[in-house]
A protein has these predicted regions:
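RNase H-like nuclease fold core
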Residues: 35-39, 111-211, 216-229, 245-252, ...
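Short Cys/His-rich Zn2+-coordinating modules
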Residues: 2-14, 38-49
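Short, conserved catalytic/metal-binding motifs centered on acidic residues
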Residues: 61, 91, 105, 155-160, ...
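Basic, short loop/linker segments at the boundary and entry of helix-turn-helix/winged-helix-like folds
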Residues: 33-96, 150
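Short, charged amphipathic recognition helices of the HTH superfamily
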Residues: 97-109
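Short cysteine-rich clusters marking metal-coordination/redox-active sites
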Residues: 26-29, 61
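Acidic/histidine-rich catalytic cores and adjacent linkers
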Residues: 23, 212, 219, 264-596
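Short, flexible, mixed-charge glycine/proline-rich loop motifs
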Residues: 12-23, 49-55
Length: 596
C-alpha cells in the first residue's frame, strides 16, 4: 500500500515548515547571534514534499554584521526561488532525456503535489541548462585529464541553424562522446570560428584529429588553429554534398513544375469528393483490400462502386509517396521524384482500368476519365518528364556510391542514425570507392554530364580526408590504435532530437525563433547519458541536485539576465509594417502630411 503513496497524500494541502540557521554563534567572531527577521509565507515546492509554506528565521551577528540563513533551506531551494533543485533536475531530464513537453511535465508534477505553470517550467528548463553549463566549466580540467588518459581526444565539429537564426556550433570528443563546448555564432565563416576553436584548444589541448563537414570556413579555421592536425570529413556530409551537386537542379525542376500544376491540391480535392461519394456505402475500402489480398473481389461488393474505390485507392497511394523514404532527407530520399513516379504509374493504371467494363457500361468508368483529364497537363509535361529521367539516372549513380561507402543504406533501417557498418574496415571502403571512381570515369554519362566529372573531382580532392588511417596514441595502459568515427552523427542525432522536442512543444516546423532564444549550452544535456562524464560532474555527490546546490544562485541569475539581454524583441504590430516596400519614405510622407 505504501508504494502508491505520493507527496500529494502525505501532507495537508498547505503544510508549513520552519527553517533556521544551524548555528547560534558567528563563524568569524564567535559572538552569539540575534534574530534579524522571520520570512513568513514563502511558497515553496520540492519533489519529496510537494507544495509547502517555508517560514525562515534569519540570524545576524551584532558585532560584525554577518547574516546567517538556513543551510537546510538553501540545500533544498535556490535563493529567491520557489522550486527546489530536485524539481529543476526533474524538468531538465524530462525535457531533454524523456522528450516530454511542458504540458506533460506539468501534469506529472501535479501528481507529485507540485503546482506549476508551463511558463515556470520553461524558465526552470533554462535554469537547468545554466546550472549544467556552470558545472561543466568547473570540471573542465578533470574532463581534460580523463580524455588524455584515453590517449587524447578527436574533435567533432558541427552546427545547426534555421532561416535567420544564429549558428549553434557544438564540439565533442569522438572517443568518449563528451560534448566539450558550444557557441552561438553569426556564421560558419573562419573569422567567427577561429576564436571559438582557440578557446577549445586552450581548455582541452590539441586534438588527435578533427572531423567536420565540408564547409570552407570550417576548413580554414581548423587549419589556422590546429596546425599539422589531421582533418577528416564526415562521410554523411560528403554524400549529402555530392547528392545535392549531382541532381539538385533536377530536383528543383520537379518541385517547381509539380507546384505549378497544383497536382497535390487536385488529388486531395478529388480524394475528398470520392470520400463523400463512398460515405453511404460501408466497407467498400475493406472489400477492395480483401480483393487485392485474395486476388478476387468479395461477392457482396457492389460492382458499380468499384471504380470509385479503385481511383480513391490510387490517389491515396500517390499522396503516400513520402512513406517510400527512409528518413534520410534529400538527397538520400527523393520525395519529388518518387511522387512523380507514382503519378506516372497511377496514370498508366487509370488508362488500363478505363478499358475494363465490370457491368458492360462505359458510363461506370467516367471516374477514370475525369481524374485522367485533371492530370493530363502534368502527365504530358515534357520538361518534367525529361528532368525525372535525368534524375533517375543520376540517383542510380549516387546509390552506387552510397553502397561503396557503406552508409545511409535503406536496408539498414537506421535512417539518419546510421554511423556506417562497423564490421567493414576503412581500407575496404576506400578500395570500393576507388572502384566506383574508376567505373564512373568509364561510364557513358561521364563525358555527357559535367556533374559526373565534378563528382570524380570531389572524390579525388577529399580522398585523404575521407579515409583516415588509425591514429597511434600513447595511454597509461600502453600504445593503442584509435580509429576516427566516420560521421558526425552523434551531434546530428542530438540536433534532430532537440528540434523534434521543440517542434512537438511548439507545434510549428520553423526553428528560427527557438534557436535565437535557446541557450548555447543546451547540447551539454547530451552528456547526461554518459556515465563516465557524470561521475566527473558529480564530484562525489550522489545527485545532480546536490551539485546544483553548490552553485552560487547569484551567478545563475546573472546568466539568465545575460540570456534575456541577448534576445532582441519587437513590438508585434511592427513586424507587419517593416516589410512594406519604401517604408522610410512612407514614414516621412506620413509625418509631412500630418504636419501640413
Amino acid at each position: 500500500m505504501l508504494l502508491t503513496v505520493t507527496s500529494a497524500h502525505l501532507f495537508p494541502s498547505q503544510v508549513v515548515i520552519h527553517f533556521k540557521p544551524g548555528r547560534n554563534t558567528c563563524s568569524e567572531c564567535h559572538e552569539s547571534l540575534n534574530v534579524q527577521k522571520t520570512r513568513p509565507g514563502k511558497r515553496a515546492a520540492t519533489l519529496a514534499i510537494g507544495d509547502f509554506i517555508a517560514h525562515e528565521t534569519v540570524y545576524y551577528c551584532p558585532r560584525c554584521g554577518r547574516v546567517f540563513h538556513s543551510d537546510e533551506l538553501r540545500a533544498l531551494i535556490p535563493e529567491n526561488s520557489n522550486f527546489g533543485y530536485d524539481i529543476i533536475v526533474f524538468i531538465g531530464k524530462s525535457l531533454f532525456l524523456r522528450c516530454r513537453n511542458y504540458q506533460e511535465i506539468r501534469l506529472e508534477l501535479q501528481l507529485k503535489n507540485v503546482r506549476i505553470s508551463e511558463s515556470e517550467i520553461a524558465f526552470l528548463a533554462k535554469k537547468f541548462v545554466l546550472y549544467l553549463g556552470l558545472l561543466h566549466r568547473l570540471v573542465r580540467r578533470k574532463t581534460k585529464k580523463y580524455m588524455h588518459m584515453n590517449g587524447g581526444y578527436i574533435l567533432h565539429l558541427d552546427g545547426t541553424c534555421d532561416g535567420g537564426s544564429p549558428h549553434l556550433i557544438s564540439v565533442l570528443d569522438g572517443i568518449t562522446e563528451i560534448v566539450l563546448d558550444n557557441r552561438k555564432l553569426p556564421s560558419e565563416n573562419a573569422e567567427d570560428l577561429i576564436p571559438f576553436l582557440q578557446s577549445i584548444k586552450k581548455s582541452y589541448g590539441v586534438p588527435l584529429a578533427v572531423v567536420s563537414d565540408m564547409g570552407k570556413g570550417i576548413a580554414l579555421a581548423v587549419k589556422e588553429v590546429f596546425k599539422n592536425v589531421s582533418a577528416f570529413i564526415c562521410h554523411y556530409h560528403f554524400l549529402k554534398a555530392v547528392g545535392k551537386n549531382l541532381f539538385g537542379d533536377e530536383n528543383d525542376i520537379l518541385r517547381e513544375r509539380l507546384r505549378k500544376h497544383n497536382v497535390r491540391v487536385i488529388l486531395k480535392r478529388t480524394k475528398s469528393r470520392l470520400e463523400k461519394a463512398m460515405a453511404d456505402t460501408t466497407g467498400l475500402v475493406h472489400a477492395m483490400i480483401a480483393g487485392i489480398e485474395c486476388e478476387k473481389l468479395p461477392a457482396e461488393c457492389p460492382l458499380s462502386a468499384v471504380p470509385t474505390v479503385a481511383v480513391y485507392t490510387l490517389i491515396s497511394w500517390v499522396l503516400d509517396s513520402g512513406s517510400e523514404g527512409n528518413g534520410f532527407g534529400f538527397p538520400f530520399d527523393q520525395s519529388y521524384l518518387v511522387f512523380y513516379q507514382r503519378l506516372q504509374e497511377a496514370s498508366l493504371r487509370l488508362r488500363q482500368l478505363f478499358r475494363i467494363q465490370l457491368q458492360g457500361n462505359w458510363k461506370e468508368n467516367k471516374v477514370y476519365s475525369t481524374i485522367s483529364h485533371d492530370l493530363h497537363s502534368v502527365i504530358n509535361d515534357v520538361g518534367l518528364r525529361k528532368a525525372a529521367l535525368r534524375m533517375e539516372e543520376k540517383v542510380a549513380v549516387f546509390n552506387r556510391l552510397r553502397k561503396a561507402m557503406r552508409i545511409t543504406l535503406p536496408e539498414t533501417g537506421r535512417g539518419l542514425n546510421d554511423n556506417g557498418d562497423p564490421s567493414v574496415t576503412i581500407k575496404t571502403i576506400e578500395k570500393e570507392v576507388g572502384k566506383f571512381r574508376a567505373w564512373l570515369s568509364k561510364s557513358r554519362g561521364y563525358a555527357e554530364h559535367k556533374e559526373y566529372r565534378k563528382l570524380a573531382k570531389q572524390i579525388d580532392t577529399y580522398q585523404e580526408k575521407l579515409f583516415a588511417d588509425p591514429i597511434v596514441v600513447e595511454t597509461a595502459a600502453g600504445r593503442i590504435l584509435v580509429q576516427p568515427q566516420r560521421t558526425n552523427n552523434i551531434l546530428e542525432q542530438f540536433f534532430r532530437k532537440l528540434m523534434r522536442t521543440y517542434r512537438k512543444k511548439n507545434g510549428f516546423n520553423s526553428m528560427e525563433r527557438v534557436l535565437k532564444t535557446m541557450l548555447p549550452d543546451t547540447p551539454l544535456t547530451m552528456n547526461l547519458k554518459n556515465q563516465e562524464y557524470m561521475q566527473i560532474l558529480l564530484a562525489g555527490k550522489k545527485t545532480l541536485e546536490g551539485r546544483f546546490a553548490e552553485i552560487d544562485s547569484k551567478v545563475v541569475r546573472r546568466g539568465l539576465e545575460q540570456s534575456r539581454s541577448g534576445t532582441s524583441t519587437m513590438y508585434p504590430p511592427l513586424k507587419k509594417i517593416i516589410r512594406i516596400p519604401g517604408l522610410p519614405k512612407s514614414i516621412v510622407s506620413l509625418l509631412e502630411q500630418t504636419a501640413s
